[in-house]
């Protein structure tokens, strides 16, 4: 049952109230409408997937959430308050972090230094305060490093913490990017195709980490992903876009059986029966 206070998931977890709400969002680029009159919400503690064919407007929607784009129409609400147009770093300070479809790391820097950049939006000490109040700045530096080290341990990349990112394989680079986002201790984590280009083993690892972030940190997650096995197994609710419009919204089972979604995206022979779903700890995508 879905209420203003939250809902119970298919595996029996309690999801909280609305964290982020997009109301009647329309985004245009010249004469092209990327998003047309879309409304949906993201609730506290859930994994919310956004799916659709290429060009459906999914990444554009994440760009609206994260402040990269300002819609021509509609309203964005965060924690019940209407959000004015904000720059991305201001959105990040609100507690919203993001990874990107294409890896955006500093290749010449170590893993630790890349993860440390995720703390920049949370730092209070500027150049002047560092000069005048050195002790306070040093304490903040120690605290930030401790947070980053914990994230590195959590994602099991401590053995490569001093390795330059340029020397890492693709799958580990994606994990470092996730670590950088988590270093800001976000309330809402936006993941834009976190498993794009990964092999089966790498996808299984990333799926496990996403579930662990949601479970152990209590982080609310909005996820764009093309692998339907991953989406259906990880997500609590799914919103489906096609040509910039919303054509479906509901639980994985509801979306799987939505005829409009099947016609536009899934295909009539796909996902006619749900994959096995055990307890929360084993909500993993199949290897097939």
Specify the residue positions occupied by each region the protein language model found.
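Positively charged, low-complexity/disordered segments
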Residues: 277-278, 282-288
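Glycine-rich phosphate-binding loops of nucleotide-dependent enzymes
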Residues: 4-270
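Conserved small/polar residues in nucleotide/adenosyl-binding loops
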Residues: 271-276
